[in-house]
């Protein structure tokens, strides 16, 4: 009997020590409820296949039809429907820009997310999947397709915008869609109506959605050294039809008009998500991704909120929708904030300059900040030359910590190959979570202490 009790006690202690030594469960609060998003069309199909989800989805759509959030929250059926859908793929679904059923996907997304917040939000979450491509990918593809001129800044004397138009004409798809929107946007309807803006916008959307960015970016963000080049860049979207109007509407009215259309609303939300100025990042962009910002900017062309260069200055880059803040009344501060997201946006300005210069940011995951009493550990790294010009030259708050000359034949403007980076840390970031895990570190194990081992031995001895 004593031996049996001793064996049970020893087994219990052994299991306790094993549990202490085992890796922690991955289902912590950081990962609870996370699931990989699917596109909203597929999520709708999955929901329709489940009677509980489909019935709750119909209920929620009826609840949101009145657009009265307080009434919806006071209704128990509406609350129950929302709780069920928050656990379904519909709640986290996203869309892809240019996908076959993009409009249907966006309609499903906004049918759930519209009305869930009180009032109108200044910044709305983007319904699109995050962009993972980089500008360096665009440069590499441009070098493959064009053969020469992969770097937009190879020659300071050439008209890069003219070169971009020539490159487009060498591609059948680009040439066809460009000729189409030029013809439509230049077609005068009557002496009082210079063009059909609706058809012009549609043709522009087709061009920027269907032509690879290796061509469209070169036309839209080409670098210029003189006014003639800058004017050609400004004329890329045929602004007399697609952009300008007799009078400038109020910017908040223009935003409200845009938000009545699911596509326009989505493109504006995506622009804010990827281009909103952030002073916590190296590039002033939310995710340090110039490509994401430029893609979001180009995605707004062909809608009521269409932005463009405000003048033909080759030295300053200022873009804006065709609107002003006159007549804003007590909403003037909000209007100015909205407008400055275009006219005084360091993220967007840096992204346009980076493409024009043929450079991209080579980011390694951020290392812990250095102590004031310690110098950074950089071995024999050449100091940056005073004349080095990069995409951050106009950014007041951007300091490049790690810049590198592009591969695939790209060269820096001063023809000196330079690479200065701090030690790279390879990390993985779990989607939907801010938790950073080093892949080589593995799960951390808790070693059983010597005290626990001694205690188990003592208790076993007493039992015997």
Swiss-Prot record:
Gene Ontology annotations for the cellular component aspect, listed alphabetically: external side of plasma membrane; receptor complex
Keyword Membrane: yes
Molecular-function GO term, any one: glial cell-derived neurotrophic factor receptor activity
UniProt record similarity statement: Belongs to the GDNFR family.
Membrane topology, from the record: Lipid-anchor; GPI-anchor
Alphabetical list of SMART domains matching this protein: GDNF
Name of the protein in question: GDNF family receptor alpha-2
Gene: GFRA2
Assembly: Interacts with NRTN ligand and RET: forms a 2:2:2 ternary complex composed of NRTN ligand, GFRA2 and RET receptor. Also forms a 4:4:4 tetrameric complex composed of 4 copies of NRTN ligand, GFRA2 and RET receptor, which prevents endocytosis of RET. Interacts with SORL1.
UniProt feature, compositional bias: Low complexity: 381-392
């Amino acid at each position: 009997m004593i031996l049996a009790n001793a064996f049970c006690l020893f087994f219990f202690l052994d299991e306790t020590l094993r549990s202490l030594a085992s890796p922690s469960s991955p289902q912590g609060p950081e990962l609870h409820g996370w699931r990989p998003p699917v596109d909203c069309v597929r999520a709708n199909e999955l929901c329709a296949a489940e009677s509980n989800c489909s019935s709750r989805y119909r209920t929620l759509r009826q609840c949101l039809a009145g657009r009265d959030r307080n009434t919806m929250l006071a209704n128990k059926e509406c609350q129950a429907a929302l709780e069920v859908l928050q656990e379904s793929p519909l709640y986290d679904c996203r869309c892809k820009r240019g996908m076959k059923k993009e409009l249907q996907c966006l309609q499903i997304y906004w049918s759930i997310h519209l009305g869930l917040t009180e009032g109108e939000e200044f910044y709305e979450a983007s319904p699109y999947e995050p962009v993972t491509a980089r500008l360096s990918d665009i440069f590499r593809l441009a070098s493959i397709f064009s053969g020469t001129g992969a770097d937009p800044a190879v020659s300071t004397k050439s008209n890069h915008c003219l070169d971009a138009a020539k490159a487009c004409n060498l591609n059948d798809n680009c040439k066809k869609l460009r000729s189409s929107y030029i013809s439509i946007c230049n077609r005068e309807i009557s002496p009082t109506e210079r063009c059909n803006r609706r058809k012009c916008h549609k043709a522009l959307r087709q061009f920027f959605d269907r032509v690879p960015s290796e061509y469209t970016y070169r036309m839209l963000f080409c670098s210029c050294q003189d006014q003639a080049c800058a004017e050609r860049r400004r004329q890329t979207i045929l602004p007399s039809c697609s952009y300008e109007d007799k009078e400038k509407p109020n910017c908040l009215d223009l935003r409200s008009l845009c938000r009545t259309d699911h596509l326009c609303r989505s493109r504006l939300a995506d622009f804010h998500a990827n281009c909103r100025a952030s002073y916590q990042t190296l590039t002033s962009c939310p995710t340090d991704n110039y490509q994401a910002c430029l893609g979001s900017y180009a995605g707004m062309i062909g809608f009521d909120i269409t932005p463009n260069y405000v003048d033909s200055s080759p030295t300053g880059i200022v873009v804006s929708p065709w609107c002003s803040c006159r007549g804003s009344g007590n909403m003037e501060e909000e209007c100015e904030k909205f407008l400055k997201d275009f006219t005084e946006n360091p993220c967007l300005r840096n992204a346009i300059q980076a493409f024009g210069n043929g450079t991209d940011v080579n980011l390694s995951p951020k290392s812990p900040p250095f102590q004031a009493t310690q110098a950074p550990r950089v071995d024999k790294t050449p100091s940056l030359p005073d004349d080095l010009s990069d995409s951050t030259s106009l950014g007041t708050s951007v300091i490049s910590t790690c810049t590198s000359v592009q591969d695939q034949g790209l060269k820096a403007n001063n023809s000196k190959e330079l690479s200065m980076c701090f030690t790279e840390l390879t990390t993985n970031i779990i989607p939907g979570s801010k938790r950073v895990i080093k892949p080589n570190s593995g799960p951390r194990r808790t070693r059983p202490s010597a005290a626990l081992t001694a205690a188990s031995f003592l208790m076993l001895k007493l039992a015997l």
